[in-house]
């Protein structure tokens, strides 16, 4: 087995953790009224699979969101493998990656599903929270990857 496989799996786990942290931002935003209605993953499930039983929408949305977070993290690993620097530079790389993930998702992919409008035409409060949440995702991912690389002595 390639030595890169365990590293990619670890990065995938970091993506799942970062997605969980991002979901806390969503939960706080929803409690404060900044994200009314269904979450974007639930909207995507409803748009892409309208015949899915309603009771399964929540589980499908969680699986979708985790899958995207894991996949985006692996993309991060491929782009920034071996990048050196401080925790601040790792967080900055992560934030840039998180915002790029938001741009691809909310300016191209999600609108293509019919779940939401293109980001500039969507609600500003929702897109502001989505930007913040994706920045948090990226910072978390970047710091996790940096921490593990430092501990392993591989930068």
Regions found by a protein language model. Give the residues of each.
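Short amphipathic, positively biased membrane-proximal segments
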Residues: 1-155
């Amino acid at each position: 087995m390639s030595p890169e496989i365990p590293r990619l799996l670890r990065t995938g786990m970091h993506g799942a953790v970062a997605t969980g942290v991002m979901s806390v931002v969503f939960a706080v935003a929803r409690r404060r009224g900044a994200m009314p209605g269904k979450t974007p993953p639930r909207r995507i499930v409803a748009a892409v699979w309208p015949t899915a039983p309603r009771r399964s929408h929540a589980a499908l949305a969680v699986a979708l969101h985790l899958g995207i977070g894991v996949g985006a993290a692996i993309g991060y690993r491929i782009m920034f493998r071996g990048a050196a620097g401080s925790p601040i530079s790792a967080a900055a790389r992560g934030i840039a990656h998180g915002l790029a993930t938001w741009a691809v998702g909310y300016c191209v992919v999600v609108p293509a599903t019919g779940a939401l409008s293109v980001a500039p035409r969507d609600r500003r409060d929702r897109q502001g929270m989505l930007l913040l949440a994706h920045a948090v995702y990226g910072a978390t991912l970047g710091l996790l990857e940096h921490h593990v690389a430092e501990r392993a002595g591989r930068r």
